[in-house]
Each structure stands twice: as C-alpha cells, then as structure tokens.
Amino acid sequence: MPIQSTIFGLSGLSLTKSEKAFFRDANPWAFILFARNIKTPDQVKRLVNELRTCVGRDALVFIDQEGGRVQRLRPPHWTNYRPAGDFAALFKDNPTAAKRGVYLTMRLIADDLRSLGITADCAPVLDIPVPGADDIISDRAYGDSPKSVIPLAHAAMAGLASGGVAPVIKHIPGHGRATVDSHKALPHINTRLQELELTDFAPFNAFSDAPMAMTAHAVYTALDPNNPVTTSYDAITNFIRARFGFDGVLMSDDLDMKALSGDLTTLTENCLSAGCDIALQCSGVFPDMIKIAKGARACLLYTSPSPRDQRGSRMPSSA
C-alpha cells in the first residue's frame, strides 16, 4: 500500500490489535497524539516506536503542544508552559524580551518532544482574535495585531526548528474572527477581503514558506460562500496556494469536528480534492478511521516512502 494522505490518532496508551492491523494496512503518512495517549515518558516512547513499527518507517508523529490551555504533555513529567497571550502582553512593553521568551519556550518544548520521538508540533497559532469572537483562540494567540503575531510566531517557529521539531502554522487562513467554536459548529465569517488581507490573513501570507499548515474549519464568504475552507477548492487552491503562494504540506483540521457535516468518507475525498495534502482524524474512534481511510484511498497523493520527496523539501527528517 502506498503512503496514504492521512494522519490518525489512536484510542489509548498502547495500540490495540485492531489498530496495529489497521495502521499496517492503511499506511498513514503520520500519527498524532493526545492526552489520552500519554502517561509517562517511557510509555510515550514505547507508543511512538509501536506506531513507526506498524508502518515500517520513521513516520512523523504530531502533537498539540502550544503552551497554556493546549498542551498534551503536562506535569508531573513535563513543564506547564506559559500561553502565547502572556508573551503578547509582554511584547507591548518589551518586544525583544517577548521574542526571546517565545523562542526559548518553544526550544524547550522541542527538547521535550524530541526526547519522546515526537517530531512535529501543531503550533504556532497565527490567528488574530477580535472583540466578540468565541474564546476558543483568545490567549492562544500572539496578540490582536499582525504587528505582534508575526514576530512572535517567527520566534516560535525558530525555537521549534532549532530543536529539530517541525512547526505547523494554524489555522490557515485564520480562525480568530470566528464567533463559534468550530469543535461545536461551523463559523461563518462575512468580513470583506480587503480587511481580511490587512488583518487575519496577514500572518499566514507572511509565512507562506512555512513547512506545514493546518486549515480553519470556517466559511469565509469572501473566498467561498458555500463551503468551509477545508473542503473549498476556491479557498485552498485558488487563494491559499495561488494568492499566498503557500507550497508547504497543507493538512486539514480534525475532520471529526462538528463544524463539518456529512459522511466522513465523502468529507475526506472533498478535503483532498480541494487541495489539502493530508486529511487529519484525531478521535481514535475506529469506525471513523475506517471511513477516513476509505476516502483517502480514492485520492492518494503520496507514493514515495519519504515525505521529503513530495512538497516536503522543507520538511524535517523523522529520525
């Protein structure tokens, strides 16, 4: 089986027999871990090795380790890192100290991840929250303006990269203006394109050379009034690819989120056909994983055993 254009989560602290068989057959491009998969450093190392053994290669292993509310590795075994919002506040008084603080924080996070064999972090958040928006982003953001978000995100990416961990910018082209949480419902954003390009879209445009990005499950009426970004050819291919010039690996946000509706197999096909390289499925719910894999089989994008042979000229080695 060629490498499939998917990233899968899993159910627990170790692989079940069914998961092992599924991963061997589906051959996903990468894996992602959550708090339910994490107990101790030694246990995580064993799990990461199990995952790579299933696919017979050094597949990338992802995690969300932003600091603040979103960090899967927590005390007592790991440090509880500050949220991005703390550095945004510091930036107002001392930009140099804020940038240095972000760099060092993400460098330490990279050390934590690499020690476990985890090679990609779904961070930094480039979204810019606005008054009245849902608080799903809030202090996960590096401020309320591109003037702080861009330099602080640059420091975050540099910190991760210097520790050998690949950053994933999110949620392209922006989620900060959403008035509902896309884990629960589909946001609709009706702001004019000219305003978006000066605000929400500016950080993503600035990092068009990033190695990886994750989509926003949101409808931008200025880009496509009928489809969320994740399944929109106009938003992904005609705007993110053509207008931003983003040529890195583009992964969806979790296809199991409530923002998206419909059959998971069809959603996967639509996501990949729209221009996403990778369909992400996080829940570890086995029937859902089977549906995602079925959809991806119809849209195989990767046929080489190395992600570096594809869009990934800027991708890290997993080893």
Predicted regions and their residues:
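Glycine-rich anion/phosphate-binding loops
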Residues: 40-43, 92-108, 147-151
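Second-shell residues forming the walls of enzyme active-site clefts
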Residues: 8, 15, 36-54, 59, ...
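N-terminal hydrophobic targeting/anchoring segments and the immediately downstream early-domain regions
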Residues: 1-61, 65-77
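Glycine-rich, aromatic-flanked loop segments that form ligand/cofactor-binding clefts
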Residues: 54-79, 105-128, 157-173
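A charged helix-plus-loop insertion that forms the helical arch/lid used to bind
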Residues: 77-96, 141-143
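Hydrophobic alpha-helical segments, chiefly the membrane-spanning helices
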Residues: 313-319
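Short, acidic/polar
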Residues: 13-22, 106-109, 263-268
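Conserved small/polar residues in nucleotide/adenosyl-binding loops
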Residues: 302-309
